[in-house]
């Protein structure tokens, strides 16, 4: 008996994993930027930024791995998606640059200019999060492909559905940021994070519901994947799990737990991501290009897999160590800047 591994599927999983880790790890510090206007006091803002200062730089590593892996392992998908998403991708990069520069320069300025960097930090976070969500919606609604090339227009990405997914991701990141503050802060700042988390949770549940209802109407493939027999046996556990996690998250907020709200919010993101995977598989460009059609030669994928097999455990190990070293509450007057 022979045993074979589908290298294209392995690479699809690696890229999906890298993107998910980026979303949850960079999501909460983008969420902190989104929430920044709600915390006008300098002392609170210092605590907020110090809570992520030791780890935020490494979060973009996963975005580079996901984007680089897509270009190397699935060059056809990369060649189609990037022209289709030029505007939101460029907007995302501009937002990340503004946020990164503001994060560092805020600590090196006088009071008169600090507010400008605070605005840049919040604005960059909003722009990056919104652009990521819009790009996701644009991919889900489908990309016009003819002869292995993008054949759509410059503004095809901008639709009511993509705006909906963009705002939904902003809300989700904000909830991640609020529950991160619950985990990492104390006193009045923590209490305000609790109350903010309640509003954001209900907003996120509404967003999940609206996106989930709208998605099957984008393409008949999505409806068949979720609602036809016997697929429904495999897809039903996802909304059931969302309901269970929601109840647990509500209870954890009501009981004012420290860690549970953050990790249960991560679980909501994981379930939403699983739903996205169910909808898209086996397409990497929905309804146009499958992962096997987009794959680079198997020899190239195997060559790259050797390097990635050692790189990912190294990044995971370093990331885990960094979070472990800098665990615990962040208090006013303490920090890394």
Place the predicted regions along the sequence by residue.
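Juxtamembrane membrane-water interface segments of multi-pass membrane proteins
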Residues: 30-54, 72-80, 104-115, 177-196, ...
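Short, membrane-exposed interhelical loops at transmembrane-helix boundaries
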Residues: 285-304
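N-terminal signal-anchor module of multipass membrane proteins
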Residues: 1-58, 64-67
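Helix-coil boundary and interhelical linker segments in multi-pass alpha-helical membrane proteins
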Residues: 1-13, 71-86, 140-160
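Central hydrophobic cores of alpha-helical transmembrane segments
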Residues: 262-270
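Long, contiguous internal "core" modules enriched in hydrophobic/ aromatic residues
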Residues: 105-257
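Alpha-helical transmembrane segments
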Residues: 11-22, 82-94, 122-126, 156-170, ...
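Membrane-interface helix-loop-helix modules in multi-pass inner-membrane proteins
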Residues: 55-127, 146, 222-233
